[in-house]
C-alpha cells in the first residue's frame, strides 16, 4: 500500500514538471549563437584530433 502511494506520487511529480521543448533545448550546450557553437565544436574536435600528435611529439622529445 505504501509502495503504491509512493510510486503514484513520484510519477505525478514527473508529469507535472515542465521543461522547455523544441529543437536544441535538450542539448547540454546552447545552439543559439552559431559562432560560439562553431568555436566550441572546433576546440572540441580539434583537441581530439591534435592530441595524438602532441603525445607523439612529447614521446620523441623525451630522453
Curated annotation (Swiss-Prot):
Q: N6-succinyllysine: which positions carry it?
A: 25
Task: Spell out the SUPFAM superfamilies in the cross-references.
Answer: Mitochondrial cytochrome c oxidase subunit VIIc (aka VIIIa)
Q: Name one GO cellular component term.
A: mitochondrial inner membrane
Provide an example Pfam family for this protein: COX7C
Topology of the protein relative to the lipid bilayer: Single-pass membrane protein
Residues modified as N6-acetyllysine are 25
Q: In which pathway does it act?
A: Energy metabolism; oxidative phosphorylation
**Annotated localization:** Mitochondrion inner membrane
Q: Where is the transit peptide?
A: 1-16
Q: State the UniProt keywords alphabetically.
A: Acetylation, Membrane, Mitochondrion, Mitochondrion inner membrane, Transit peptide, Transmembrane, Transmembrane helix
InterPro entries per the record? COX7C/Cox8, COX7C/Cox8_sf
Function, in words = Component of the cytochrome c oxidase, the last enzyme in the mitochondrial electron transport chain which drives oxidative phosphorylation. The respiratory chain contains 3 multisubunit complexes succinate dehydrogenase (complex II, CII), ubiquinol-cytochrome c oxidoreductase (cytochrome b-c1 complex, complex III, CIII) and cytochrome c oxidase (complex IV, CIV), that cooperate to transfer electrons derived from NADH and succinate to molecular oxygen, creating an electrochemical gradient over the inner membrane that drives transmembrane transport and the ATP synthase.
Which family would the database say this protein is a member of?
Answer: Belongs to the cytochrome c oxidase VIIc family.
Q: How does it assemble?
A: Component of the cytochrome c oxidase (complex IV, CIV), a multisubunit enzyme composed of 14 subunits. The complex is composed of a catalytic core of 3 subunits MT-CO1, MT-CO2 and MT-CO3, encoded in the mitochondrial DNA, and 11 supernumerary subunits COX4I, COX5A, COX5B, COX6A, COX6B, COX6C, COX7A, COX7B, COX7C, COX8 and NDUFA4, which are encoded in the nuclear genome.
Recorded protein name is Cytochrome c oxidase subunit 7C, mitochondrial
Q: What gene is behind this protein?
A: Cox7c
Amino acid at each position: 500500500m505504501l509502495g503504491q502511494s509512493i510510486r503514484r506520487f513520484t510519477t505525478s511529480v514527473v508529469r507535472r514538471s515542465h521543461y522547455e521543448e523544441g529543437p536544441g533545448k535538450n542539448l547540454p550546450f546552447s545552439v543559439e549563437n552559431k559562432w560560439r557553437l562553431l568555436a566550441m565544436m572546433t576546440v572540441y574536435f580539434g583537441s581530439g584530433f591534435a592530441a595524438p600528435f602532441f603525445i607523439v611529439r612529447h614521446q620523441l622529445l623525451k630522453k
